[in-house]
């Protein structure tokens, strides 16, 4: 007897996650919805490096050293790896509260603040938390229905609370937070070195060619080199400046969001409770500390009730799994009767027994 197995589509948690993120590769890749500038970043890096490897590297490897394209390839691969790691990873999104958790938090807030008279503004929903003998305020997020952890903030573009939120970077197409900040820093650092490297050797290439055929003839014969020089010149200042700014933040163990708001350098002159007072310790904590795991569980499987589908009943399941074919027959002995008799059309009724001979003679 053949049995047909019916498989239903599994609903994973990333398909039902709130927010404005997009997912690819069955939830393994997580990005923001606005990815146009990210594609521009890829185009500029890939286009500039392709021209550099196709023209300048071939000439410089023969005239100067074959190590020039090797080192350029190492910088290029490292920059691309850190860019994709920053763009495709979870920056540290904090899950929103479930309905039961949100109701419990609301009851806790009402019990703490008391009843608010009608017409008056309710007090701010803030909890005080002490870190290194410093009072830190935990703010309530009305979208996620949670009290945000220290240094967390709600991104208005991705519509999620991100742990140790630094900023939303459209150039990488993702938020920069606790789980991908180190990769973001390594990306802009390696990109700065790559830009300086390509720009410098383009100048060397033009100088060497100008010694043979002249400066104007070199510019006419190598329009790709001119394009590379222009791209590197205009992007060099912004990338190198951004790297220097984030190096300053890493040394202080501070985020871009805290620097913009003036959390530790404002009028109140409150000391940064997260700084160790040592540049080396701060750099080790930000860039070399253990990477926390993602708390989203994007590829987890949702129950049928939460995925929006109705669980099949027992009768539906049995009828869908069993084949619609007649039951197998068994071989019976001549003196055995089957438990389930056939229909009247298939089995004729038995003939009445003949009366015995003695009863017939008595009647006569």
From Swiss-Prot:
GO MF annotations, alphabetized: palmitoyltransferase activity; protein-cysteine S-palmitoyltransferase activity; Ras palmitoyltransferase activity
Record-annotated DHHC domain positions: 139-189
Alphabetized UniProt keyword annotations: Acyltransferase, Disease variant, Endoplasmic reticulum, Golgi apparatus, Host-virus interaction, Intellectual disability, Lipoprotein, Membrane, Palmitate, Transferase, Transmembrane, Transmembrane helix
Localization per record: Endoplasmic reticulum membrane; Golgi apparatus membrane
Membrane topology classification: Multi-pass membrane protein
Top EC category: transferase
GO BP term, pick one: protein targeting to membrane
Annotated catalytic residues: 169
Residue ranges, compositional bias (Pro residues): 346-356
Lumenal side: 57-63, 205-228
Compositionally biased intervals (Polar residues): 310-323
Region (Disordered): 303-364
Disease annotated for this entry: Intellectual developmental disorder, X-linked, syndromic, Raymond type: A disorder characterized by significantly below average general intellectual functioning associated with impairments in adaptive behavior and manifested during the developmental period. Some MRXSR patients show additional features, including marfanoid habitus, epilepsy, facial dysmorphism, hypotonia, and behavioral problems.
Protein name in UniProt: Palmitoyltransferase ZDHHC9
């Amino acid at each position: 007897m053949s049995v047909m197995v019916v498989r239903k589509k599994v609903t994973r948690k990333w398909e039902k996650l709130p927010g404005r993120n997009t997912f690819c590769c069955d939830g393994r890749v997580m990005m923001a919805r606005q990815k146009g500038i990210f594609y521009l970043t890829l185009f500029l890096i890939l286009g500039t490096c392709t021209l550099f490897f196709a023209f300048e590297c071939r000439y410089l490897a023969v005239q100067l050293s074959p190590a020039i394209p090797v080192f350029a390839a190492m910088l290029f691969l490292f920059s691309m790896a850190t860019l994709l790691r920053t763009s495709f990873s979870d920056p540290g999104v904090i899950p929103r509260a479930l309905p039961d958790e949100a109701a419990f938090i609301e009851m806790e807030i009402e019990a703490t603040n008391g009843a608010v008279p009608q017409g008056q503004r309710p007090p701010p929903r803030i909890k005080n938390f002490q870190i290194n003998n410093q009072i830190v305020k935990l703010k309530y997020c009305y979208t996620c229905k949670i009290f945000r952890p220290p240094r967390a903030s709600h991104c208005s573009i991705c519509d999620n609370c991100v742990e140790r939120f630094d900023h939303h970077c459209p150039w990488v197409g993702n938020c920069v937070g606790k789980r991908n900040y180190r990769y973001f820093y390594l990306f802009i650092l390696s990109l700065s070195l790559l830009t300086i490297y390509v720009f410098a050797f383009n100048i060397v290439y033009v100088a060497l060619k100008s010694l043979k055929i002249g400066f104007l003839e070199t510019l006419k014969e190598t329009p790709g080199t001119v394009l590379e020089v222009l791209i590197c010149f205009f992007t060099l200042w912004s990338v190198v400046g951004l790297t220097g700014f984030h190096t300053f933040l890493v040394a202080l163990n501070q985020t871009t969001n805290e620097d913009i708001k003036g959390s530790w350098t404002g009028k109140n002159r409150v000391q940064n409770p997260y700084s160790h007072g040592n540049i080396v310790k701060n750099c080790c904590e930000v860039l070399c500390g253990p990477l926390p795991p993602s708390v989203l569980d994007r590829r987890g499987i949702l129950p049928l009730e939460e995925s929006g589908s109705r669980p099949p009943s027992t009768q539906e399941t049995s009828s869908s799994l069993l084949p619609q074919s007649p039951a197998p027959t068994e071989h019976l002995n001549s003196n055995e009767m089957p438990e389930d008799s056939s229909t009247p059309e298939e089995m004729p009724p038995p003939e009445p027994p003949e009366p015995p001979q003695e009863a017939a003679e008595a009647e006569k």
